[in-house]
């Protein structure tokens, strides 16, 4: 495929992008905390929310020394020290209750210093904006809290929120926000700050160049992953059919010694 044809196809894809596409949302919100602030204010129903030091970070890596690291779509902290993990999920699989619990636990763990027993934990909010109504109750927003015997709030400060991206009500703030997340044309969006960011990446030369570079990087990453998976499959095949150890299989396949550790961790 020629570079020009590839570029034109990329531009066609960019024109169809919505904020519900997490890669596009990441670009729109990257280094633009006012967009994050708006979304949080609408979802939380609190126009006083202000991000601390105008801090928000996209694709925020949170470490887990005991298990798998997690990359949050958007991480933010407000002036009250409340911490937010904002996730875009188009599939039900990625928005399960256990994932919400896991993300919540990682935020707690990363707040605690050595010797701290959690007395100073800030409130945390794991927020999933889902393309469909994954909880199937027809509501715009679902707030999940812990209760004492099903009656009184436990007030542990850990909150999980699901936002139904398919909710339609252009008379309400949340309905207009979800309209904008579904909308591919910035000219039809309600919230000016979101429309301006989407318009920059869709309808200016500089923004289009940034998006085309992002898509090129995504293709390169996908190709690298495919090559790694193919090599891994070959290693496993030799181990199974030839009864080789992992190291023997990698040597037979002429895998660079510097990559042994990487593949060993994937077996």
Where are these regions (language model features)?
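Short, charged alpha-helical interaction segments and adjacent helix-coil junctions
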Residues: 2-15, 77-79, 84-89, 173-267
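Pocket-edge structural micro-motifs
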Residues: 128-131, 164-165, 202
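Generic amphipathic alpha-helical segments used as scaffolds and interaction surfaces in large
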Residues: 27-31, 164-168, 181, 185, ...
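Low-complexity, glycine/alanine/valine/leucine- and proline-rich hydrophobic stretches
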Residues: 147-156, 161-164, 177, 181-184
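Accessory alpha/beta interaction modules
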Residues: 1-157, 169-171
């Amino acid at each position: 495929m020629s570079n020009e044809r590839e570029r034109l196809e990329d531009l066609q894809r960019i024109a169809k992008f919505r904020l519900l596409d997490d890669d596009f949302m990441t670009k729109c919100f990257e280094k633009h905390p006012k967009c994050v602030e708006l979304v949080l204010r609408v979802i939380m129903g609190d126009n006083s929310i202000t991000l601390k030091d105008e801090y928000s970070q996209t694709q925020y890596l949170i470490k887990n020394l005991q298990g798998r690291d997690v990359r949050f779509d958007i991480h933010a902290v407000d002036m009250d020290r409340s911490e937010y993990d904002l996730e875009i999920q188009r599939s039900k699989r990625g928005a399960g209750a256990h994932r919400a619990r896991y993300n919540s636990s990682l935020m707690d763990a990363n707040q605690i210093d050595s010797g701290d027993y959690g007395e100073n934990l800030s409130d945390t909010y794991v927020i999933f904006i889902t393309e469909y109504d994954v909880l199937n109750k027809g509501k715009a927003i679902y707030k999940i809290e812990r209760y004492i015997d099903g009656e009184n709030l436990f007030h542990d400060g850990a909150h999980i929120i699901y936002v139904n991206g398919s909710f339609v009500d252009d008379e309400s703030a949340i309905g207009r926000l979800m309209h904008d997340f579904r909308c591919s044309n910035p000219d039809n969006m309600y919230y000016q700050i979101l429309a301006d960011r989407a318009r920059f990446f869709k309808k200016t030369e500089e923004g289009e160049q940034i998006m085309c570079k992002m898509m090129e990087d995504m293709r390169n990453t996908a190709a690298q992953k495919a090559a790694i998976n193919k090599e891994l499959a070959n290693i496993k095949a030799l181990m199974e059919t030839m009864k080789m150890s992992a190291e023997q299989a990698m040597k037979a396949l002429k895998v660079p010694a510097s990559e042994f550790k990487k593949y060993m961790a994937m077996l």
